[in-house]
Amino acid sequence: MVQLNQNFINSIAKDMPDHLSMDEFISYCAKPLRPSIRVNTLKITTADFITMMNAKGWQFEPVPWCEDGFWVKVDDSVQLGNTVEHIQGLFYIQEASSMLPPKALFPEPIEDATSLTLLDMASAPGSKTTQLAAMMNNQGLLVANEYSSSRVKVLHANVQRMGASNLALTHFDARVFGKYLFESFDAILLDAPCGGEGTVRKDPDALKHWDESEIEAIASVQRDLIESAFLALKPGGSLVYSTCTLNRRENQDVCLHLKATYGDAVQFESLAGLFPGAEKASTSEGFLHVWPQIFDSEGFFIAKLTKIAAVPRNSEEPRKQKNFPFTPIDKKSRQALCDYFDTSFGIKLDGQGILMQRDDEFWLFPTNVDPLIGKIRFQRIGLKLADALKKGFKPRHEAVMALADRLRGIPLDEAQAIQYLMGRDIALTSKEKPQGERLVSYQGAHLGLVKHLGNKLKNSLPRDLVRDKICSSSAMAVDQQATGED
């Protein structure tokens, strides 16, 4: 049962537009959220995914502001997060409202992102980060930052699962970006830490202990963050500021603070025409203030601005950092690595990015990262491709999953796919010539690596990716599987 603090209701009533009803707001807060997903177009087309899952009984209702987003209806026995398709990274379970900020940043499809350098200032768990990576088609550079140590691991796991390869991960208080990467980014998403007032439909206790006195402390951090973002933004660049909270002080007032600080250099962009019906949530400034009852979603706030003029630095330029541990790969190793990936997996490494080496490790960096090297410390850049062995290479799961052509995998059926994801070997029905490292796939999408030994496929799935619980995405198959268990 949802817990709405009466003090919260009294406070938020001051910010609610006159055309909205408090009774309706309270009613919608008590309703469970409709499950929603975003198809990962880095791994499958939206049309192919819909066709594939319609055959399994899934029903889809389009999210108006995201071409790849859908509210879904599935059988109660289907656990979305435990399906093979979810583990493969074919879709992300993402609340519909949280698909809005990336759409606001890029209202039109990006035709060519190779020259773009983006920053996602508060990335975890990765829904918007991976949405941006898909919109960029893994081109250009996306710097994904997360301050919380406990959430960095979750961010990396989701980035890896979704096959995003154009990322560089950082782990900082995002207030440093304006100083260390001054006017370095073409576009920035700041999904700011907030009071979370819009999440009560997902977390019934989110507002149980709501305290108005905490808002100013949160808003103070948000003001610092939006200033840092603005300083890190190139002149002419776009900044989207968003929260999952509802009060004005964490939303409109933070944006107006930036305007008051930097004046005519800040130009607000209206989002009233972002999608059909967006005007229902539009404010006088052109921001979107999404109350739960407007679109039957979580509460959210989204603002977009353009930096129309350069601004002065507010601190000295930091000294360049030294001792970067990576060097460009030598010519001989480069040729051997490229030949191996081409022969084994059909992956053409040339033209994909910058090939780098650290000791016996080989990495693929996004092309645009070089100007940022030495200005800030990265936790991880791009993809680790392989480790060098005495003879040959040991390929990395995440690299092959992100780069390999969909048609290259050894096809498995659903039962075999589930066995594989549980860490088990796959027996072959007839003995064949051993083929070494290979990919296995299910429904045309990759599952991971195996070693083809002739009589079986030896599982090479990293141990941290092995799952104990996996369910079928088909209600009928789930029932059959359950019947077979004792």
Swiss-Prot record:
Keywords: Cytoplasm, Methyltransferase, RNA-binding, rRNA processing, S-adenosyl-L-methionine, Transferase. Pfam families: Methyltr_RsmB-F, Methyltr_RsmF_N, Methyltranf_PUA, YebU_pre-PUA_dom. CDD domains: AdoMet_MTases. Its EC number is 2.1.1.178. It catalyses: cytidine(1407) in 16S rRNA + S-adenosyl-L-methionine = 5-methylcytidine(1407) in 16S rRNA + S-adenosyl-L-homocysteine + H(+). This is Ribosomal RNA small subunit methyltransferase F. Belongs to the class I-like SAM-binding methyltransferase superfamily. RsmB/NOP family. PANTHER family: 28S RRNA (CYTOSINE(4447)-C(5))-METHYLTRANSFERASE-RELATED (PTHR22807:SF30), NOP2 YEAST -RELATED NOL1/NOP2/FMU SUN DOMAIN-CONTAINING (PTHR22807). It comes from Shewanella loihica (strain ATCC BAA-1088 / PV-4). Specifically methylates the cytosine at position 1407 (m5C1407) of 16S rRNA. It is found in: Cytoplasm.
